[in-house]
């Protein structure tokens, strides 16, 4: 879908231009969302699919970054939104 490709391109752009740990974390976040959205066969993305993409992104950042709720990281802002 267009949404999946846009999210994937955001992740690629961040990976090319943003250095340090933040760049890696944001790249992981957007690439995980891209994977979930791309799996959708619909031309439009539903709110449920956006929520699933956010949950997958949070899980990926937690997995690769080693943080979880309460660690005072980006995840503390994202988890309540999911």
From Swiss-Prot:
One of its GO terms (biological process) is glycerol metabolic process. Residues 1-82 form the DhaL domain. The keyword Phosphoprotein does not apply. GO terms for molecular function: glycerone kinase activity. SUPFAM superfamilies: DhaL-like. InterPro entries: DhaL_dom, DhaL_dom_sf, Dihydroxyacetone_Kinase. It comes from the Eukaryota. Its EC number is 2.7.1.-. It holds the Pfam family Dak2. Keywords: Kinase, Transferase. Belongs to the dihydroxyacetone kinase (DAK) family. This is Putative 3,4-dihydroxy-2-butanone kinase.
